[in-house]
């Protein structure tokens, strides 16, 4: 018996991808302990024999699930930043557009992987690598803003840890409110009030979707990076202009 609620391939049979999608839903809803062959088969309306046609066992499904997470929750961040071009403001907006607008990104999936990592060294190692890659991507964005070395990396870490904490704490905040606050976060994180120039929630949303152009080339941090170290600026109470 074929599943009534799953999209079938051209042949009418459920494929390997269908199993991974079903496993993803179970992982988010019940945790890794709930991702078992019998519940999956029942949810899909097929026998367990269908599972073993595509997978040698649960570990192969788990490996496919991790790869799916890479593809759906990390690759879009790289693609968005690459498509944004060289302007760091557009890169920043693109990165946060994936997060805030949840474009090809499922925060529940990320959190489920983090929960899984608590009991699996393999998943923990994989998660650590992906977290590192995402932070490296953000570091490059901050380098394009004009920071270098540790200042760029620390801003990237604070930005990333802030967002991960937002999800981990299950903060309930309307998307419109998040967009409204975005310029204030951006000013703190990038050291410059550039996003306020987008004027409205609609303007910020459009910017996150790539529909924005800046009349000037980015030079906002030249005074900061060419003058004294960031730590000295903090001690003196100065800020970028």
PLM ranges: what are they?
Residues 55, 101, 113-119:
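Short helix-capping/turn signature of helix-turn-helix
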Residues 18, 25-64:
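Helix-turn-helix
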Residues 67-74:
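Short, basic, alpha-helical segments at the C-terminal edge of helix-turn-helix-like DNA-binding modules
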Residues 106-111, 121-146, 151-158:
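Amphipathic alpha-helical packing segments from all-alpha helical-bundle domains
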Residues 78-109, 159:
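Hydrophobic alpha-helical connector segments
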Residues 145-207:
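Hydrophobic/aromatic-rich alpha-helical bundle segments in the mid-to-C-terminal region
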Residues 1-14, 196-241:
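N-terminal intrinsically disordered/low-complexity leader segments
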Residues 78, 96-97, 114-115, 139, ...:
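Amphipathic alpha-helical segments within well-ordered protein domains
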């Amino acid at each position: 018996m074929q599943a009534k609620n799953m999209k079938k391939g051209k042949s009418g049979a459920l494929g390997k991808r269908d199993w991974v999608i079903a496993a993803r839903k179970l992982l988010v809803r019940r945790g890794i302990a709930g991702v078992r062959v019998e519940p999956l088969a029942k949810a899909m309306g097929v026998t367990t024999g269908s599972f073993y046609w595509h997978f040698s066992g649960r570990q192969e499904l788990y490996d496919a699930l991790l790869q799916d997470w890479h593809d759906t929750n990390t690759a879009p961040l790289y693609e968005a930043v690459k498509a944004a071009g060289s302007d760091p403001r557009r890169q920043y907006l693109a990165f946060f557009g994936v997060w805030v607008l949840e474009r090809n990104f499922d925060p529940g999936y990320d959190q489920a992987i983090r929960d899984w990592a608590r009991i699996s060294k393999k998943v923990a190692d994989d998660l650590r690598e992906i977290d590192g890659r995402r932070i490296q991507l953000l570091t490059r964005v901050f380098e394009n803003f004009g920071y270098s070395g540790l200042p760029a990396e620390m801003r990237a870490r604070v930005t990333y840890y802030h967002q991960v904490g937002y999800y981990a704490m299950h903060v309930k905040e309307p998307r419109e409110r998040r967009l409204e606050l975005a310029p204030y976060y951006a000013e703190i994180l990038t050291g410059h009030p550039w996003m306020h120039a987008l004027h409205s929630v609609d303007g910020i949303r459009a910017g996150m979707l790539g529909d924005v152009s800046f009349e000037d080339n980015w030079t906002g941090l030249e005074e900061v990076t060419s003058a004294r170290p960031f730590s000295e600026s903090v001690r003196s109470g100065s800020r970028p202009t």
